[in-house]
UniProtKB/Swiss-Prot annotation:
One of its GO terms (biological process) is amino sugar catabolic process. This is N-acetylmuramic acid 6-phosphate etherase. Disulfide bonds: none annotated. PANTHER family: GLUCOKINASE REGULATORY PROTEIN (PTHR10088:SF4). InterPro entries: Etherase_MurQ, Glucokinase_regulatory_CS, MURQ/GCKR, SIS_dom, SIS_dom_sf. Its EC number is 4.2.1.126. It comes from Bacillus cereus (strain 03BB102). It is an enzyme of class 4 (lyase). Coiled coil: none annotated. Keywords: Carbohydrate metabolism, Lyase.
Amino acid sequence: MLENLSTEHRNEKTMNLDEMNIKEVLQSMNEEDRTVALAVEKEIEHIEKVVRVVIQSFEEEGRLIYIGAGTSGRLGILDAVECPPTFGTDDKMVQGFIAGGLKAFTKAVEGAEDREELAEEDLKSIGLNEKDTVIGIAASGRTPYVIGGLKYANSVGASTASISCNKNAEISKYAKLNVEVETGAEILTGSTRLKAGTAQKLVLNMISTASMIGVGKVYKNLMVDVQSTNEKLVERSKRIIVEATGASYEVAAEYYEKAERNVKAAIVMVLLQCEYGEALEKLKEAKGFVKKAL
């Protein structure tokens, strides 16, 4: 029942929200937002377990699939679409599905989240299999679309995890691993795009970033698989080579072109003074880890 969910409770500190001036509203929001990271901190052990499973999927050439409705679905898609430019993944490695399809990203699709079968259809469309990990996201922890997706994922042997913002969430029953970040009452009653949405974004950031580190997408704290899809990222790529090798900007730019804009290869070439082909071979042997290739 909705009334039993902490995310649906009224916030005692903001009973007079409509009477506050603008500054008071903003201060109230900021005060509540400060509690979110602390709530996430309590779930780090559970988040770690999810990351380990995602890394295993990636190592087996499986995928990470997010499913959710409304804000939760949008956050999953947001995290997924940032992976190719940041970590050089293909667009299949991390995917996000939202109840109602992509059109629901910009406009609510009435009733879509209440249909379990829609998630099964979405997951069947990508040939979900036992190598994949499916993460169901729902602030309330009871969204039928997410439950349907988790049920189907379990039926094909995929790894499953859930992210919710209430304890003892319904979706937790359908996932092997659970992250339950209790964010409590929102300043605007039931508006889970606020603290709950912020918590979900923080958790998704953790899962995708830590998983990518785990499969060699990062060297030191540099995103060495960055894709140079625009002028800003071309410059960032050259700066990454400078930071990783200590070479001058001019040398970094030279090796960036020699390596056919492959930042990892350029770093190996500079540090080992080898040719492009040899750098690629070393990276292949090291399964993409720059440190091991060196």
